[in-house]
Structures are given as C-alpha cells and as structure tokens.
Amino acid sequence: HRGAITGMGIPRGVTLIVGGGYHGKSTLLKALELGVYDHIAGDGREYVITDATAVKIRAEDGRSIQNTDISMFINDLPNGKDTAHFSTEDASGSTSQAANVVEAMEAGTSLLLMDEDTSATNFMIRDALMQRVIHREMEPITPFIDRVGELYKIHGVSTIMVAGSSGAYFHVADHIIQMDHYVPRDITGLAKEEARAFPLDSAPLPPAKGPDFGRCPRTSPAFRGSERVKCKVLGRDGVSLNRETIDLRYVEQLADAEQSAALGCCLLYAQKRLLDGKRN
C-alpha cells in the first residue's frame, strides 16, 4: 500500500547471476528464494518479491525417489533401471537433482532457483574435453545446460541460477546479472560478446518428454492397517510419521518448524483420505 516502487525486475527466461567470490551472488539468490513470503516492515527484503511458485533446487544425495520419470535428464543406466519410472532409496547427486526438478514441475512451478555450490557438477555441465573423451552415447546424464532453454520455451519454467566457475551458461542465458560489491548490474551484452570466442561443443537435442502429471500415488506401507498414526515434528528439519522420517533439511525455503508440522498434517490427511492408487 505504499504506491509505486522502482528497482530491478528479472524477466522470465533463463537468468544467470555471476560475480567474484563474496560479492553477493548467493545472498541475492537466498533473498529471491525467500521472496515467496511477505516480510515484516523494516526487514530490508520487503520489496524482494518472487513468483509464488518458485522452488529452490539442489542436489540431495541419499534421498528416496519413488516411481519418478527422470528420463528428461537420465537415460540408459548401465544397470538397466527404467528411468521413466525411477525408484531408489539412495539417490546420487545427479539423480536426486533430476528428481527435484521433475517433482517441482509436477507441483506446478514456474521458476527454478539454483546455485552451483549446492548442485551436482555432472548434472549441470559437461565440458568440451570430457565430451570428446566420453562420448554422448556412453553418458547416461543429459546435463541441465542442454535442457534449461527447453524448460522455458516448451514448459514455461524459468530458471535463475548462480554460477561462479563456468561460463558455459552464458550461451544459454537470456539475462546475465553481475554482482559487484553487492550491487547488481546487467552485463548480458558484454557476456554474450565474450562467449562468442568460446563456442559450446554440443549438438542440439530433440525435446524430451515432459513430467507425468497423471501419477496416481499409493498409500505408504507404513500406514496400512494403522488407525492411529503418530506424527512427530523434528523441528524445521523434518517430521516422523509412524517412525518413518521425512527429511526436510534440504528444503531450503522452509523457514519455521510450524511449516514442518503443517506438512506432516497434510501428509496424514492425504494418506487417510486421498491416496488410493487411482486418483492423480
């Protein structure tokens, strides 16, 4: 209710945040990921406003994945596992990050927020030398750099990403912001001009199949035949339902233990009233 304000708007598309170490790249991303909330007056972030559907994505080694289609990023695994219906109790960095992206899309996100510091390197990029030594047909991982433009153009999902070590994303970014002593400035033209001297050594890929919006979740075995299900809140880090722990440590947009409690209650309600293996 304070009238018009001025500032830097980040357009839809693929946006890269770059800059030297300790110049504020991750700080800006952190402000954006918490911009899905209203802030108290005087907080300093009142006008950092982010798309309400924005999801922070990171690698999450060891997480569980159940029947998720990660074939957009992972295919032809040596063990023969079907990546269109992928399940594991101990995901790697790349498979966990692939699943996190796909699940966010299934949930209806329009914006992914990523930081290279918390991402799996082999999920994000493969440099030219590695591609020459390990040919594409021998590599089951399609790196995010090969899909990020497609996510926006075909699926309407934008990406804002922090990068400090590789300039490869200059080629696919629509907008490039440099943080200089905590001050952002648009260097898209400069970065694109410099990138022309370092062309990407990769051929365009055909579009991948999008996420499955018709999945029909089934009730967890931990709830079957149980009338009284105990829900224990483990602070902001997670909840325990019938002694099955749901680890929320890497869901970085959660800000309070009460949110963990609310999520536990939502899961209990869904398990008892909604999940029947027939409805999506």
Label each residue range with its predicted role.
Residues 153-156, 162-280:
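Conserved NTP phosphate-binding and transfer environment spanning the P-loop NTPase/kinase superfamily
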